[in-house]
């Protein structure tokens, strides 16, 4: 990762951890239900997957700090992902992260903005009307003024559709809705 950061070919580094029990899947029951929606797994399989993911090797504090230092040195933007606590925001703020991707609650989105971070939600979340993992509703967050940007996430066409959904179903001014995606 460091060599890519130093190559000049990277514009953004996002520190992501999808380990069940924190972030997007703080609630292990939600993780299990989501997993069962994608795969034919038993409760025992879910427990095994949770254990394996929780025990898997992750970047250490020192490694994250070192990568963030290289990113800052190279002018690469730093993002945090699935922010779920003030402690995580404080840690990421200390790394000079300027983006909070997919804060999991309205309180965390507001706290990220209070720290000067740009907040991002997924346009598919706007289309669905809710998070697929039971977290922050992008519609609610946009209406509360807690989201700065909508991204395509896993469905690029959702960007344009989200603009009209925000206008038609949330009463957001069309220019403000377009500003979220452009």
Go through each PLM region and give its residues:
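A general structural motif
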Residues: 58-61, 80-82, 99-109, 128-135
């Amino acid at each position: 990762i460091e060599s890519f950061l130093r190559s000049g070919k990277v514009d953004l580094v996002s520190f992501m951890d999808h380990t069940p029990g924190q972030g997007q899947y703080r609630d292990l029951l939600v993780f299990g239900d989501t997993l069962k929606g994608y795969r034919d797994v038993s409760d025992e399989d879910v427990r095994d997957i949770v254990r394996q993911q929780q025990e898997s090797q992750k970047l250490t504090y020192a490694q994250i700090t070192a990568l963030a230092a290289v990113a800052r040195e190279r002018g690469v933007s730093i993002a945090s992902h699935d922010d779920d606590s003030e402690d995580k925001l404080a840690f990421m703020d200390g790394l000079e992260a300027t983006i909070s991707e997919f804060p999991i609650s309205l309180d965390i989105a507001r706290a990220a903005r209070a720290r000067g971070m740009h907040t991002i939600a997924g346009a598919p979340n706007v289309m669905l009307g809710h998070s697929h993992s039971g977290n922050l509703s992008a519609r609610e967050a946009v209406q509360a003024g807690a989201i700065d940007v909508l991204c395509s996430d896993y469905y690029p066409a959702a960007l344009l559709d989200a603009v009209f959904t925000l206008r038609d179903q949330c009463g957001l001014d069309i220019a403000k809705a377009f500003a979220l995606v452009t």
